[in-house]
Amino acid sequence: MAKKVEKLVKLQIPAGKATPAPPVGPALGQAGINIMGFTKEFNARTADQAGMIIPVVISVYEDKSFTFVTKTPPAAVLLKKAAGVEKGSGTPNKTKVATVTRAQVQEIAETKMPDLNAANIESAMRMIEGTARSMGFTVVD
C-alpha cells in the first residue's frame, strides 16, 4: 500500500547551499524530517546548478520519511541572470532597467517548459515576456 502524505513543504533554496540553519532547518524540523539527510541529498542533486534559486516541494509521509521534487528556477531569477542585473525595477511602468532579446526569452521558456502550464513554446514565451515587463525589462527582437 502507498504511504500516506502527511504534509507538503515548499521552499526556495539556493542550489547546493542547503544548510540546517534558518530558514531550511525550522521548516523541516516542524515537519519532523531528518534535516541533515535532506540537506545532503538536495545539495548533491543541485550541485550542477550553482548560483540559482531552486524551488523544492517536499512530501512528508506519516512515518516521517520524505521525498522531494526540484523545480526549475523562477522566471524572474533566469531573466535577471540573462539581463545581467541584480534586481528588477521598482516602478516597471516608468523606469526600464534592462533589455532582453526574444532569443533569450525563448531559451528561458524552454528551460521553464516542464513547470509552466503552457501548451506550446509560443505561449510559454508570452508568459516569460509578461514576467519580464512586470520587472521593468524591455523585450526586443
Curated annotation (Swiss-Prot):
Record-level GO cellular component terms: cytosolic large ribosomal subunit
Zinc is among the record's keywords: no
UniProt PTM: One or more lysine residues are methylated.
Annotated signal sequence range: none
UniProt xrefs under Pfam families: Ribosomal_L11, Ribosomal_L11_N
InterPro entries on file: Ribosomal_uL11 (IPR000911), Ribosomal_uL11_bac-typ (IPR006519), Ribosomal_uL11_C (IPR020783), Ribosomal_uL11_C_sf (IPR036769), Ribosomal_uL11_CS (IPR020785), Ribosomal_uL11_N (IPR020784), Ribosomal_uL11_N_sf (IPR036796)
NCBIfam families given in the database record: L11_bact (TIGR01632)
GO MF, one example: large ribosomal subunit rRNA binding
PROSITE patterns: RIBOSOMAL_L11
Subunit structure, as described in the record: Part of the ribosomal stalk of the 50S ribosomal subunit. Interacts with L10 and the large rRNA to form the base of the stalk. L10 forms an elongated spine to which L12 dimers bind in a sequential fashion forming a multimeric L10(L12)X complex.
Annotated family: Belongs to the universal ribosomal protein uL11 family.
Gene3D superfamilies reported in the protein's UniProt record: Ribosomal protein L11, C-terminal domain, Ribosomal protein L11/L12, N-terminal domain
Top-level taxonomy: Bacteria, Bacillati, Bacillota, Bacilli, Lactobacillales
GO biological process, one term: translation
Keyword rRNA-binding: yes
Alphabetical keyword list: Methylation, Ribonucleoprotein, Ribosomal protein, RNA-binding, rRNA-binding
Superkingdom per UniProt: Bacteria
Name of the protein this chain belongs to: Large ribosomal subunit protein uL11
Organism in which the protein naturally occurs: Streptococcus pneumoniae (strain Hungary19A-6)
